[in-house]
Amino acid sequence: MFQPLRGIDDETEIAWALEWIIGLFESKGVDITPDIENTVWSALQSLASAPEDQRTLTGLSALLQDGDLRLALKPFTLEGAYGHILDGNSYALSENDTQAFEMEELMHSKALVAPVLTYLFHKLEARFDGRPTFLILDEAWVFLDDPMFAGRIREWLKVLRKKNVSVIFATQSLADIANSPIAPAVIESCLSRIFLPNNRAMEPQQREAYDSFGLNKRQVQIIASATPKRDYYFQSHGGNRLFDLQLGPVALAFCASASETDQADISKTIKAFGSENFAQQWLNFKGLEWAADLMSAEFNSEEYVPWLDAAE
């Protein structure tokens, strides 16, 4: 559960919160006028003086004098369908170097996509401080299908490189990008591309999408004849090549464990043995006892220095 209004005692945050709340109202068909903006601004200013755990959407609703605005906000409070995600009273995001968000629920609720992702993008943007960062947008169609996010991503692609952030789009279909209003920006800014095998790549409709990425007939033929789950076609200004990662059984035990069954087994393994012992126990579970034994022997060696400690 997120608490988007927690930091509104800060000038930058309250300005962002005004824009975000106005977006919620617009999504519910509210005609935004200067009077409505003033009403929301006054309510936010009043809420900013409350303790942090009271700066919630429910708290904001109580301060709004307009009944129509309270009604429009209700779905996003604890009284509505989406309050369990957006009406929290504590900070739910960690400051870990790796941060992941499960988007499956958002994919099934279009009304949640814009407010939740706007908030998450806002928090992530604040963390981009020049350190090398990957921003991976999996199932990219969720972002590309919304005009508001199309505009945001177009902006990000232009400026994030200056902050040492690499944006990675992942999508099951090139048409998601080719048919998006930000297709020119994506194609122009994403100079390195990796295409997965597609035995239908030479079909006319599919071919159009590949054409938009500058692939010629021979390159599309290579993609069409490549081996699924093994081959990848890399395209860049520096050259193009079909490659195979040649992952062995140990690497595949981790990199290829993406099914729902695998994820359930991973959760069970962590619950039973803890996260610190996960790698060894997962190798055992996958029938790679020899690799688990090697890892155990290495970890128990007096000469072993964890890479995190070594980095310090």
List PLM regions with ranges:
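P-loop NTPase motor domains
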Residues: F2-V165, F169, A178-P181, Q219, ...
